[in-house]
């Protein structure tokens, strides 16, 4: 794809329209790399569940959850690590769910007393066997980190376009543009979009719409402006 086409794609995205010059993506319900949609749905649901496990609430405002899985061990996959957006916890603006998960995986894989005990060189190679599931499309920073790591697969639920439509401030560069521009990197990554978006979307639709129901296990605060764990 020529640079002019990349520019047209990005410009069209600014107006909330996916450009026709972008390459088509595979149907998310297909069996890709020997992994069924049912299996992918299970891992995407775990990315949602990571919110409650790691953030302490099933309805954090920044409800971005990630799991990293090894499908080369078995088609069903082996969980390596999880991560959630930690901006509010750490104050670090780069602590997005994907970055937190990659950091957690690196620590787990190199832990000298852990299961894997890999060297730094071995970890770099290990990422090429792993799949990253995130319940919302990665920002350009995280999509770039995914490509630098060389993940075998990158799977997301809710799209950036959907987030923007529902009030979220986003850098309007879709992951497919990052992937198209990263062909010089040594390891290819397969991108799968909109997996289980019908279940990931509700985690991002209540923050700017007081009339939208809170996620399961949460209820509106008295002001109606936010959601909290438990019943009202």
What are these regions (language model features)?
Residues 38, 89-96:
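Residues at secondary-structure transition points
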Residues 80-87:
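Short beta->alpha transition motifs characteristic of CBS
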Residues 63-72:
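Short beta-strand scaffold segments in enzyme catalytic cores
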